[in-house]
Amino acid sequence: VSQDVLTPARISGIHKEAGRRRTFAVISHPDAGKSTLTEALALHAKVIGTAGASSGKANRKETVSDWMQMEKDRGISISSAALQFSYRDTVINLLDTPGHADFSEDTYRVLAAVDCAVMLVDAAKGLETQTMKLFEVCKQRNLPIITVINKWDRPGLDALALMDEITERTGLQPMPLTWAVGISGDFRGVWDLRNDRFARFQRNNAGAQIALTEYFTPEEAAESQGSNWTDAVDEAGLVIESNLEFDVEAFHAGKATPILFSSAALNFGVKELLDALVDFAPPAAPRPDVDGNPRPVESPFSGFVFKVQAGMNKAHRDHVAFIRVCSGVFERGMVVTQTRTGKSFATKYAQQVFGREREVIDEAYPGDVVGLVNASSLRVGDSLFLEGPVEYPAIPLFAPEHFQVARSKDPSKFKQFRRGIEQLEHEGVIQVLRSDVRGDQAPVLAAVGPMQFEVVEDRMAHDFSAPMRLERLPYSLARISTADAMPALANVIGAEVLLRSDGEYLALFNDVWALRRIEKNHPDLTLVPIGTHNPAK
């Protein structure tokens, strides 16, 4: 399929489709209600009939986006998926992010593929550690952030105290789009500031259906809600006075964050979030390549792999590479080029994947996510293009903090063991470190959080029939180093240098004191902190 014939009609068609896209992810601390919000958004867009809850309540459907066996067992979303739906003539792509603290590496990759983030805050807890870690990543990527204060139907913090915390800890100015009427735990509804009306909150069947919302004028609200209404108006007024009225440019520039109040479990406040995404979130725009040159959206097809997932369909043992379309039109069946290898890749099996739901996708536009099946040659960070070579920036690796040696339980299955470890490394499930001293039989697995090891063990046993033993190492921090650190630290207690497959040498240390001791004794050694903003070369 040639896309080099760019007629004015074709250019305007691509621009129109890119302009209709809103691609975002939800960032939050575990248990802030992220999967519930995902369900509520899908419900509002009429994608699913009734929302399922992650907590596995009887007679409620399972949450659609949680699909791996471990996720089902634990009620958390470990693997990311993408949900696409239409709302008000806008195509919304919601990229699901793992809901567990340990999976920040996978979450980070998802944040490389979105244009905006929704920061979901538990009203009772405020900004928690994982939320702040993810916020920092969004800040580095210059992603605009919409803030949703969730669970307002339960007792929690004071609304103004939450605004102060957001300002102090993120540096963003809160710009209310809606404001809660009634204190947390006594949720009466919201003042919709854009339309100057009161949306009254009504409890429904535990969120399984869309909440019925009734709207009232400010005068009617003042009469029915009394001091709850006047307090809400006063509070929102204080926030606007000390910050600013809604300003799209300040939001896009990462200086301010729109604020909405909700109860996602009861489907209240969700429509207002959808409206905010449509009206204010940035559409798919030209994406810069490695040299910083933005590739126009009307250029021939290009995209990059932000996630690789295997074992999504047990019957087929398949591999799905998730691609963010950056330019042009993706058409199923087109043969594209992989920038890293220069090899051709046929896109015959292209799907939209959300949870266990899959459907064949024939075309996709900038901002969309395509799942390419049988994509075992593709790796996280790979760029693909139809015409006009392009390479997008590499997706950085997080600094690992947990290290374990892996060995095959059955020596006769070493081949399967090696293949499994290689495959999981390609998928980005785990970082793999090696050295001549340890040998090929005992690679060191490095993870951001300990649950990644459970995923590796589970996948090795079930997907590769290569059960393995893990042995914990005492290291807790890593630094980027060079080859000459290997002999220098060979006999040092509390330190070790290993080679990662991308060619980086990592020096591992028991603790910060071991690191300081070595920095003092070997001032000539390169020991650089691993920053999420330093792409792995």
Regions from the language model: what does each represent?
Residues 1-537:
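Structural and coupling elements of P-loop NTPases
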